[in-house]
Amino acid sequence: MARKARETSLTGIYHVMLRGINRQDIFLDSEDYWKFVKILHQQVNPKDELGSPLPSKCDIYSYCLMPNHLHLLIRNRTEELGSIVKSIGIAYASYFNKRYERVGHLFQDRFRSEPVNDMNYFVTLIRYIHQNPVAGGLAKRVEDYPWSSWIEFESPTKCQMPVCATGAVTNRISMDELKSLVNEPLSKAAVVLEFSKEERDQQVEEDLRAFLTTHFGITDPQELCDLPESKRDAILQAAHHMGVSIRRLAQLTGLTAYTIHKSVR
């Protein structure tokens, strides 16, 4: 299935989401969170080898780091969006793999993004991104969660490593209004980063291929048809356990749904 081309933002602003491969946690303790914040800080405040400032690669308007995924509201400046996100992902994955003595992919192969073309949606996303921990049951209030950019808005003098262009946000909406809105739940009509069934199926395929390559050295899911039954069944069970449905396994491997059902039950 061909990948759908990313939509281009008229404003240069995008909502980006990165998620751990197989939805695994990508932040295990505070040191991990701080490392990622530092990487974001370096993106907006780059320096050359001698420590002299370079033009900023991007503007970041808000972020939120959750245990197995993260959100960014970002505008690319001197580099393409894909290059910026790739740079962030590689820097963090290198740190994470070294610290935890692991190999292979850390993030899903393809990050999610959507263009932000109007002011109303920009404000909706500021609220949505900061409300993620509340919606996920990790905090009662936006201000209680330590790993989002909200502290940069509410208490900038307490922020140890500023990342966001908060002034660009408060030039569009007053701080008083933002504070009153940020803990107000979004309506169900505020659709944020929805993806079609085809896009979800494509992401499952990419996750499965990465999983098979990393753990079993298998580059094509249809290779499972030629494996000894015991090994094939063990791999199918592992893939099903990571969340791939029997229907999707059948489509990708060429095995019948009945065969897969017997293998994973």
Give names to the regions the model predicted.
Residues 1-62, 66, 75-265:
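Short Pro-Cys-Gly-centered "Cys-loop" motif that presents a nucleophilic cysteine in a tight turn
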Residues 69:
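Short acidic-rich active-site patches of cyclic nucleotide enzymes
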